[in-house]
Amino acid sequence: MSQPKKILFITLSNIGDVVLTTPVLIRLAQIYKNARFDVVGDQRSEMLFKHCPFINKFYRKDKSKGFMGTLNLVRRIRADHYDLAVDLRSDGLLYLIRADKKFNKVKNNNIHSAEKHFLSIKQPTNLMPKTEIWLNKQEKIDARKLIPKGYKRILALGIGANSEHKIWPAQFFAELASMLQKNFDFILIVGDSRDNKFVPIFKEAYGGEFLNLCGKLDLLTTAAVIKNSELFVGNDSGLGHIASAVQTKTFTIFGPGEPHRYRPWGEESYWVQDKQKIIQEIKPALVFKKVMDAFGYDDEQ
């Protein structure tokens, strides 16, 4: 096959999963510098790829439209003929589109998902780029405006998740924030509107000044806020992956998940998990110690 000029990239849906596929897309763009990239994903992945400089077209999958919506999507994609198609989802779409060469996802549950995705394009993992989220100038400006002037060392907390078994108690986050506050100028909470129910519990237990941004920002402005933060501490959710992708120090508190496969990818991404995978058994003092040890903060400040 000659150098591909048209490449179709089929990504995933959940925020964290999408972030973990970005090294594949970035590497393909490095190899095939003159190629046109089209991407298939859902509304969340479309937002994450909004400012990606080498994407030509985005095909949005919408489960709510059912079979006819899927059929229409296939027809639209089949109107084009691709030199290469890479499918990291494996829901059958790869077999319905037209492409000279096709790569499917690798089945290996013993390695990290970022590495597994990368192996699908037959590249050695030592060439794997970092995960990435693309932000524009306005998102960065809007994020900076939210932080009081003079505050530079920001601690961002992600106190929600999409499953109750993944949620560390809000009062524990408050205790941790109290322990860490002398190392930071300001504390803020990020998340979607569903996470607001945890904020009153945090507020009562913490008692200090903080900014609640849950449900107030779009995904990319939230990413820009996290990028402006020195450290992100949160539950096993997409926000931890976003933090790592914008090169912010990241610490994840795991419940029943599998850190060896799904932890945020990056050299400054750390995590903790109870041996029985019961998140409520992880005490704030333990998280504090691990954060201090991981990132070298001074306990005597």
Report the location of each language-model feature.
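Catalytic machinery of carbohydrate-active enzymes
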Residues: 1-301
